[in-house]
């Protein structure tokens, strides 16, 4: 609109923006139910009450609306024949899946874990890939002594290992109470290795001599950082959580330092106890090279004269030594019932005190498998009984009072 010279020109906003402000025809808003077929109250395929059958769709629906809800969300259907423990959480599926087999061989006291492959792992490196490997721990009692590890696969989010890791000395008590922790990590040569995800499998899910297949999504359970990398406040929280975990697991929980295979037999002909030191497995590493130089000592207590000590030879640079040595204690069966056999494993060091790795006591005051092994030996003379035992970090009473050499 133009005015005369000198007059103020007025233009309304509608004319300036050329917008038609008149409302058009009001159309009904579609509801979400309009995009999906409705099941009628009648039998399937029939339309009772005018409802749309399950197999029919209204002609006005777009192709996107005809797709099933799972296709709209990008979901996939797992294979019917595979044994899959699936998770619906996006946080878990984003980490990837791990496929593996577990087999508990009760006769040989071995737990076999075959790591097959992983799929869709979370990228951890700048190139959008990862360098994944798998490590195993047995809980409770996770430590370097019972850690097993696969090889590292380079630059892949879908690694294939097909690698078998084996735990020796697994007892029925372990199967009842322990949990296998399977962690997938990314190896980084320039900094610390990064945690991707983990799976925890209670061993009680396994049946003896029956292989069980798993294909499970990784879970986001990042382990606590090391004390050196934490502030004072975080260290306090870490200590509190560890104390809480120990309280939940029960009092008197000791750190596991490996396993030892012992043979006991009372000889009625020789009137004495035969103690066989067969082998050890998954010993704790005491040297800077990641190994130990282990040997085994045995005592039959109480030992007033200190003459009951026996010692095996030293095995160099190994965490799984084989000894196959036998010691004999001349003693009557009635007296043996009041004694305690203490077996300790040590790391030999030149020029300094030897390091205690772990020990186990068998006798009337023992518990669990150690007590059962001792009682079976007393009640089954002239029979060699081999059993695996867990070595713990606590030094048996008065064991340190004897020379370590």
Swiss-Prot record:
Residues 42-54 have a biased composition (Gly residues). Ca(2+) 2 binds at residues 287, 293, 347, 349. Gene3D superfamilies: C2 domain. One of its GO terms (cellular component) is neuron projection. Its cofactor is Ca(2+). Its main location: membrane. Calcium sensor which most probably regulates fusion of vesicles with membranes. Binds calcium and phospholipids. May be involved in calcium dependent neurotransmitter release through the interaction with UNC13A. May be involved in calcium-dependent spontaneous release of neurotransmitter in absence of action potentials in neuronal cells. Regulates Ca(2+)-dependent secretory lysosome exocytosis in mast cells. Interacts (via N-terminus) with UNC13A. Interacts with cytoplasmic dynein light chain DYNLT1. Interacts with UNC13D. This is Double C2-like domain-containing protein alpha. It comes from Mus musculus (Mouse).
């Amino acid at each position: 609109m133009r005015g005369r010279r000198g007059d103020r020109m007025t233009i309304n906003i509608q004319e300036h923006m050329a917008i038609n402000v008149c409302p058009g025809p009001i159309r009904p808003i579609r509801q979400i139910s309009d995009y999906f077929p409705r099941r009628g109250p009648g039998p399937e395929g029939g339309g009772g009450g005018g409802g749309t059958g399950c197999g029919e769709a209204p002609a006005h629906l777009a192709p996107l609306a005809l797709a099933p809800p799972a296709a709209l969300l990008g979901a996939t259907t797992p294979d019917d024949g595979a044994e899959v423990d699936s998770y619906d959480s996006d946080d878990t599926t984003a980490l990837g899946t791990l496929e593996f087999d577990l087999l508990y061989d009760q006769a040989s006291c071995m737990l076999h874990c075959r790591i097959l492959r992983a799929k869709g792992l979370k990228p951890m490196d700048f190139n959008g890939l990862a360098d994944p490997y798998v490590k195993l721990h047995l809980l409770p009692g996770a430590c370097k002594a019972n850690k097993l590890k696969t090889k590292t696969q380079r630059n892949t989010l879908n690694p294939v290992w097909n690698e078998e890791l084996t735990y020796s000395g697994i007892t029925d008590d372990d199967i009842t109470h322990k949990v296998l922790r399977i962690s997938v990590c990314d190896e980084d040569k320039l900094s610390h290795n990064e945690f991707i995800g983990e799976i925890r499998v209670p061993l009680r899910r396994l049946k003896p001599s029956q292989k069980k297949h798993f294909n499970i999504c990784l879970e986001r359970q990042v382990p606590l950082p090391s004390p050196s990398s934490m502030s004072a406040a975080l260290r306090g929280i870490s200590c509190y959580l560890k104390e809480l975990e120990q309280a939940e697991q029960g009092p008197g929980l000791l750190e596991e330092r490996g396993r030892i295979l012992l043979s006991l037999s009372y000889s009625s002909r020789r009137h004495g106890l035969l103690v066989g030191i067969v082998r050890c497995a998954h010993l704790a590493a005491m040297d800077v090279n990641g190994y130990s130089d282990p040997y085994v000592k045995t005592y039959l207590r109480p030992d007033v004269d200190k003459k009951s000590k026996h010692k095996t030879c030293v095995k160099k640079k190994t965490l799984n030594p084989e000894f196959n040595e036998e010691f004999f204690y001349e003693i009557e069966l009635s007296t043996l019932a009041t004694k305690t056999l203490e077996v300790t494993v040590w790391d030999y060091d030149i020029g300094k005190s030897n390091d205690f790795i772990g020990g186990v006591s068998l006798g009337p005051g023992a518990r669990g498998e150690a007590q059962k092994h001792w009682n079976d030996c007393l009640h089954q003379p002239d029979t060699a009984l081999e059993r695996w035992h867990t070595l713990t970090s606590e030094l048996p009473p008065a064991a340190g009072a004897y020379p370590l050499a």
